[in-house]
C-alpha cells in the first residue's frame, strides 16, 4: 500500500531520539493531523501509548513501528533506509481493543480500553475472591487467586504468557481468560472464550478483599465489578514487514524455549 504523508513520533529515550533525528534528515514529514501513516520509534510500551493516543483522540491512522526498545513484539526492525519501499510492501493487521466497563465500590463508573489485556488484581496481602460469568452464565462462583486477566491475541504473549496463559493465534477469534496465582479451584488454569463473549467479574467481599482493575496501564482501584467485551467500533491498524508479520511472530512464540 502507498502512503504519501508520514508523521514521526518517538519515545523520549536517547536511542529513539537519535534515530528520529536521523530519519528527519532523510524524509519529508507532516503534522499528525495531515498524515496518512504514523512512524513510531520505541519499544512495545511506546507502541501501546501511541495506540491509546489514537483511541483517545479518534485518529484512525495505520502505525509502522520500528524497535528501539527491548522486546519489540509489536515493532519492526530499526532500519532508516528504504522506509517508503517498506511501507509499500507492508502487511496490515487490524486489532480491536478490549472495552472495560468498571464500577467501584463507591459507585464511580469508568470505561477504559486495552490493546493487550484487562487485569483484576488484589490490592492487599489478602487473596482475591471473584465470581466470573460468561454471557450471563456464572462459570466460576468463586475464584481464589491473586487476580485474573483477559487477553487479546496481540496481548497473549505479554502478561498473559507470564501467568502461564495460552498464546492465541492472531486470527483465532478467541480471548484468553487466565488466573494469576490461582489457589481455588485447584485444577483450574484458565479458559479460552470466543471474542464475542461478554465477561463479567464481580468482587466477592470488596471491603475485606479490595481489588483494582487495570486496562493496559490504566488502573481503577476499589473495584466492585467489571464487564469486558471486544470493541469492534474502534479498529487499530498495525503495519509489519512481510517477513515479520504479527501472525508469524505469534506462531513462532509458541515454540520458544527461553
Curated annotation (Swiss-Prot):
Subcellular location: Cytoplasm
One Gene Ontology term, aspect cellular component: cytoplasm
Enzyme Commission no: 2.7.1.23
Gene Ontology terms: biological process: NAD metabolic process; NADP biosynthetic process
Binding locations of NAD(+): 44-45, 116-117, 146, 154, 157-162
Catalytic function, reaction form: NAD(+) + ATP = ADP + NADP(+) + H(+)
Cofactor(s) the protein requires to work: a divalent metal cation
Keywords on record: ATP-binding, Cytoplasm, Kinase, NAD, NADP, Nucleotide-binding, Transferase
PANTHER family, per the entry: NAD KINASE
UniProt name for this protein: NAD kinase
Organism: Zymomonas mobilis subsp. mobilis (strain ATCC 31821 / ZM4 / CP4)
Amino acid at each position: 500500500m502507498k502512503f504519501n504523508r508520514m508523521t514521526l513520533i518517538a519515545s523520549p529515550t536517547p536511542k529513539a531520539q537519535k534515530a528520529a533525528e536521523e530519519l528527519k534528515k532523510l524524509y519529508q514529514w507532516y503534522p499528525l493531523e495531515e498524515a496518512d501513516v504514523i512512524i513510531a520509534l520505541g519499544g512495545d510500551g511506546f507502541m501501546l501509548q501511541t495506540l491509546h493516543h489514537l483511541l483517545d483522540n479518534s485518529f484512525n491512522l495505520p502505525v509502522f513501528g520500528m524497535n528501539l526498545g527491548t522486546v519489540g513484539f509489536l515493532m519492526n526492525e530499526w532500519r532508516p533506509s528504504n522506509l517508503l519501499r517498506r511501507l509499500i510492501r507492508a502487511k496490515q493487521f487490524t486489532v480491536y481493543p478490549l472495552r472495560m466497563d468498571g464500577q467501584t465500590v463507591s459507585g464511580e463508573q469508568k470505561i477504559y480500553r486495552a490493546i493487550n489485556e484487562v487485569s483484576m488484581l488484589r490490592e492487599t496481602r489478602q487473596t482475591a475472591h471473584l465470581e466470573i460469568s460468561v454471557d450471563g452464565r456464572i462459570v466460576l462462583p468463586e475464584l481464589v487467586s491473586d487476580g485474573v486477566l483477559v487477553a487479546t491475541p496481540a496481548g497473549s504473549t505479554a502478561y498473559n504468557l507470564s501467568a502461564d496463559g495460552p498464546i492465541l493465534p492472531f486470527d483465532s477469534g478467541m480471548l484468553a481468560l487466565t488466573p494469576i496465582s490461582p489457589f481455588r479451584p485447584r485444577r483450574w488454569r484458565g479458559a479460552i472464550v470466543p471474542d464475542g463473549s461478554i465477561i463479567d467479574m464481580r468482587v466477592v467481599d470488596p471491603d475485606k478483599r479490595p481489588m483494582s482493575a487495570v486496562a493496559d496501564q490504566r488502573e481503577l482501584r476499589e473495584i466492585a465489578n467489571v464487564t469486558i467485551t471486544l470493541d469492534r467500533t474502534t479498529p487499530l491498524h498495525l503495519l509489519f514487514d512481510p517477513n515479520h508479520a504479527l501472525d508469524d511472530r505469534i506462531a513462532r512464540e509458541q515454540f520458544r524455549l527461553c
